[in-house]
Curated annotation (Swiss-Prot):
TM stretches of this protein: 98-120
Known tissue expression: Skin.
Annotated GO MF terms: epidermal growth factor receptor binding; growth factor activity
Single GO cellular component term: plasma membrane
Propeptide residues per the UniProt entry: 24-38, 89-133
Signal sequence bounds: 1-23
Domain of life: Eukaryota
Known glycosylation sites: N25
Name of the protein this chain belongs to: Protransforming growth factor alpha
Origin species: Ovis aries (Sheep)
Record's function text: TGF alpha is a mitogenic polypeptide that is able to bind to the EGF receptor/EGFR and to act synergistically with TGF beta to promote anchorage-independent cell proliferation in soft agar.
Length: 133
């Protein structure tokens, strides 16, 4: 027996609501991870010659390697923070990213469910229609 489209839609809605509830109860990630004192001592501020080195971030000078490095602002990645991280730009926090991904997956799943139900219905109609010679 194939469940009706309404039953499948209610089932999908129940799963969606359960996942949303679980996401609300989860703890969010730390905004700034702690940095050990030993790590901080390996960096200095960049010299004036490197003020424009990072496109979307803060320049830090690596003492051991004697070269600049970038600490990217939120939403940017790359060696010089030159690439936008589109998911981070659309959804700034980790929780919003998870909810955005969940909404996209739910919409795709519902579209697949609707298409499947329509195809099943069409097959049933063809099966029950009488072929006139």
């Amino acid at each position: 027996m194939v469940p009706s489209a309404g039953q499948l839609a209610l089932f999908a809605l129940g799963i969606f609501l359960a996942v949303c509830q679980a996401l609300e109860n989860s703890t969010s990630a730390l905004s700034d991870p702690p940095v050990a004192a030993a790590v901080v001592s390996h960096f200095n501020d960049c010299p004036d010659s490197h003020t424009q080195f990072c496109f979307h971030g803060t320049c830090r000078f690596l003492l051991q390697e004697e070269k600049p490095a970038c600490v990217c602002h939120s939403g940017y990645v790359g060696a010089r923070c030159e690439h936008a991280d589109l998911l981070a730009v659309v959804a700034a926090s980790q929780k919003k990213q998870a909810i955005t991904a969940l909404v996209v997956v739910t919409i795709v799943a519902l579209a697949v469910l609707i298409i499947t139900c329509v195809l099943i219905h069409c097959c049933e109609v063809r099966k029950h229609s009488v072929v006139v010679p």
